[in-house]
Every structure is written in structure tokens, then in C-alpha cells.
């Protein structure tokens, strides 16, 4: 990877495009980069130490917390607090938003929402996992503690978002609203290097990603769409390929590169869907729109939804533009059949 730009160099270059930029966002992204390296090191050695498995506690959603969930949450929180650009964080692993109390943090203008380790239950079987993050400007007065209102903002107000995927190689993918860029971690120099510049998702794809084990519980429109994907229509490129890893970051990353759609609809047991709007769906929606795709709850643009609670859930359809539009058509056509 010699000759490639590192993430740090790239951020500085982009900052130079804005003469009045303070550098706070650049420093914040450096904090995320540092925490990602620390978590990556621990994940790579997960099978050698006592860091896999559950800790015996549940998060606010009632999900068993894995040891690495707690570890990643602690490391990202510590890194974000240390640089003084963040006044508070909200996390899947925290019941409530955390306001940083140091005076320097209270003078910061950003809040961060995150899923510190998406897909962590897959660690034990060596499946790719990831970190998802979303950054907003606070709405509360600078110089005061962060409030819940700082976090309950619609996705279109994000100033940056991204994810880290810990897989066969580790990548950090992010956007600040000017395209999507991916950086692969080079352990020989300890840096993320630009490997995927101006990432764009194809308008059409041949991959659909959904947990078909829940088929019987899906809305009728989703069932019909799955059957549509499976039909043998060679001139239309069907049947499509079914690929579902069970880690949002991993499924999203593959579809971003190759074209496809990820679906997590409402079900009988989860009528509001299962994925969280603020720190899973919104950041992925920002990324996919910047890459030329679409993110929807089946009716509405994800980033237009006004959140009412920190851990709010929504149905989620994200990926190639034409594929998301098609599933929306099926949902509308069969809406009265529920």
C-alpha cells in the first residue's frame, strides 16, 4: 500500500477545502480511528483470551451483552471523551445518553451515536463484525451538558457517519456529505490507507439479504418481493442470489461494493422492526445516499424520520436504488393484505 494516502492525510486534505474549518471534526474522526485500531487488535486475538462470549448482562433492548460489546463500548467512549470535541455519546450498550462532564467537553459542539460492535454474537464463530457511528452538531447551548435533544435529530442533520468492518481485512468507510471513501488498515504501518475512493453502489443489483428464517412472519409485500427475487427470469437477471451474514455492517458492505438490497422488515414479533434508527439505520442511510442508493422504512426516507426515543426501532430497506424502489412497490401493492 506504499504511496497511498492515509486516513489522517485524507482528512487533512479535505479540511483544507474549507478555509474556515476549525479542525474539530477532523480530530473527532481521529478519535474514532484510534478506538477502531484498539478494538481491531482485541478482535484479532479474541480466540486466544477470555474476551469472547456473554458477560451475563443485557442491554436496554434485552439482548445479551457480549464481552467484546462492553470492551468496544468502553474504548470508543474513552477515545471520544479524551479529545474534547464531543460533549456526549449515545450507544446501543447504554440505557441513556452519556453527557461528558469535563468543561472542555461541555464546550464541544458534536455528539456521537454508535453501535460499538454490531454482530458481536458472531465473534465466537469468526464472522465479520463492525462498528457503526453517526455524528451530529449539538442543538443545546455550548458550555452546558449534552441533553437528549442533541441526539434526537433526524438523519438528514448528520454531519458525518461511517462504519468499521473487522473482517479478512479491517476497513473504515465514512462520509461527511461529500461522497463515500473507504480505508483499509495496514498493520505493517499501523494506518488506515485509502483503498476505495468515491464508492458508488450500482443502481441495480443481484443480491438480496434477509433472514428468510422469519419468512412466515414477514409482511405480505416482503413475501411477494422475495418470491420475485427467486423467479427464473434470465432476461431480467433473476433469480437473484440470497446472501445473509447476520451482521448489518458485513451485509451492507458487500452490497455497497457489488450492488444489492438489505432488508429487515417489521415482523409479527417486532412490528416496528428490529434495527435502531439512530445508530444503525441513519448512519447507513447517510452512507448509501452518498453512494447513490436509497434507504427506506418501506414508505418514508429513513433520514426524514423524526426520532422520539433513543433506542427507537424502524423497518429497514437499504441498497441499490432500483431494488429498494421495487420492494416499496410490493409493500404498497399488498399493504391491505396484512
UniProtKB/Swiss-Prot annotation:
Gene Ontology molecular function terms on file: fructose 1,6-bisphosphate 1-phosphatase activity; magnesium ion binding
Chain positions recorded as substrate binding sites: 118-121, 211, 244, 262-264, 274
GO biological process entries: fructose 1,6-bisphosphate metabolic process; fructose 6-phosphate metabolic process; fructose metabolic process; gluconeogenesis; sucrose biosynthetic process
Pfam family, one: FBPase
CDD domains, alphabetized: FBPase (cd00354)
Entry cofactors: Mg(2+)
EC number from the UniProt entry: 3.1.3.11
Entry binding sites for Mg(2+) 2: 115, 118, 280
Disulfide linkage: none
Reaction(s) catalysed (UniProt annotation): beta-D-fructose 1,6-bisphosphate + H2O = beta-D-fructose 6-phosphate + phosphate
Binding-site residues, Mg(2+) 1: 92, 115, 117
Places the protein is found: Cytoplasm
Co-factor binding details: Binds 2 magnesium ions per subunit.
GO-annotated cellular components: cytosol
Major site of localization recorded for this protein: cytoplasm
InterPro entries: FBPase_C_dom (IPR044015), FBPase_class-1 (IPR000146), FBPase_N (IPR033391), FBPtase (IPR028343), Fructose_bisphosphatase_AS (IPR020548)
UniProt family annotation: Belongs to the FBPase class 1 family.
Oligomer and partners: Homotetramer.
Annotated protein name in UniProt: Fructose-1,6-bisphosphatase class 1
Provenance organism: Vibrio parahaemolyticus serotype O3:K6 (strain RIMD 2210633)
Organism lineage string: Bacteria, Pseudomonadati, Pseudomonadota, Gammaproteobacteria, Vibrionales
Gene that this sequence comes from: fbp
Amino acid at each position: 500500500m506504499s504511496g497511498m494516502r492515509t486516513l489522517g492525510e485524507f482528512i487533512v486534505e479535505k479540511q483544507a477545502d474549507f478555509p474556515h474549518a476549525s479542525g474539530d471534526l477532523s480530530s473527532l474522526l481521529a478519535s474514532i480511528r484510534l478506538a477502531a485500531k484498539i478494538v481491531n487488535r482485541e478482535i484479532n486475538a479474541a480466540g486466544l483470551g477470555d474476551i469472547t462470549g456473554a458477560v451475563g448482562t443485557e442491554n436496554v433492548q434485552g439482548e445479551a451483552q457480549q464481552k467484546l460489546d462492553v470492551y468496544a463500548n468502553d474504548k470508543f467512549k474513552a477515545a471520544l471523551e479524551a479529545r474534547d470535541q464531543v460533549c456526549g455519546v449515545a450507544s446501543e450498550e447504554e440505557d441513556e445518553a452519556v453527557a461528558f462532564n469535563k468543561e472542555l467537553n461541555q464546550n464541544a459542539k458534536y455528539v456521537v451515536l454508535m453501535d460499538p460492535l454490531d454482530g458481536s454474537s458472531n465473534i465466537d464463530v469468526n464472522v465479520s463484525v463492525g462498528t457503526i457511528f453517526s455524528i451530529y452538531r449539538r442543538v443545546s447551548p455550548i458550555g452546558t451538558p449534552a441533553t437528549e435533544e442533541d441526539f434526537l435529530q433526524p438523519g438528514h442533520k448528520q454531519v458525518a457517519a461511517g462504519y468499521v468492518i473487522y473482517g479478512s481485512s479491517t476497513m473504515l468507510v465514512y462520509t461527511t456529505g461529500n461522497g463515500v471513501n473507504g480505508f483499509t488498515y495496514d498493520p505493517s504501518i499501523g494506518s488506515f490507507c485509502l483503498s476505495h475512493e468515491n464508492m458508488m453502489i450500482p443502481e441495480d443489483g443481484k443480491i438480496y439479504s434477509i433472514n428468510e428464517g422469519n419468512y412466515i412472519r414477514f409482511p405480505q409485500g416482503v413475501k411477494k418481493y422475495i418470491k420475485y427475487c427467486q423467479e427464473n427470469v434470465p432476461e431480467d437477471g433473476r433469480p437473484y442470489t440470497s446472501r445473509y451474514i447476520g451482521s448489518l455492517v458485513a451485509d451492507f458492505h458487500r452490497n455497497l461494493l457489488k450492488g444489492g438490497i438489505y432488508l429487515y422488515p417489521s415482523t409479527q414479533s417486532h412490528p416496528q422492526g428490529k434495527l435502531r434508527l439512530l445508530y444503525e439505520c441513519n448512519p447507513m442511510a447517510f452512507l448509501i445516499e452518498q453512494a447513490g442508493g436509497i434507504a427506506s422504512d418501506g414508505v418514508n426516507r429513513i433520514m426524514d424520520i423524526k426520532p422520539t426515543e433513543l433506542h427507537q426501532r424502524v423497518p429497514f430497506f437499504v441498497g441499490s436504488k432500483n431494488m429498494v424502489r421495487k420492494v416499496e412497490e410490493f409493500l404498497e401493492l399488498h399493504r391491505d393484505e396484512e
